[in-house]
Amino acid sequence: MSISKATRIKVYEKYGGHCAYCGCELAYKDMQVDHFVPQHGYFQTGSDEIKNLMPSCRTCNHYKRANPLELWRVFIREIPLKLRSGNYIYKVGLKYGLIVEHEHPIEFYFERVERERAEAQGGES
C-alpha cells in the first residue's frame, strides 16, 4: 500500500527530520519510511498507522529490513565480531590501534529522544 504525502510528512516530523534509528539528519526527499513492526507482524491492518511508521535513512532501512527491533539490535552488536572473523584490514587496524572497539548498549535515536522527553517531563513541577 502506498503511503500518502500527508502521512510521509508526519513521519518525517516525528523525530525532527532525523533517522529514528541512527539519528542522522535526513532531507525529506531522502527519507525512507520503515515499518517499526514489520508488515507481516500485523494482522492485515494497522501496519501503515503513524505509530508504526518510522523515518529512516537508506542504510538503516536496508539493514533493518523486515526484522523486529531486538533482532536488529543483536545484528548491530555483533558487527565487530563479524569484522574480526573475516576482515584482514579490520584486524590490522585493531592491531595498530587505528580501530578501537567499544561495548555499550545499542540505543536507537528514537529511544534516546523518548527517554529525554520523559526525563524532561518528570523534571517539571
Identify the function of each model-found stretch:
Residues 1-10, 24-28, 51-54, 62-125:
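Extended charged
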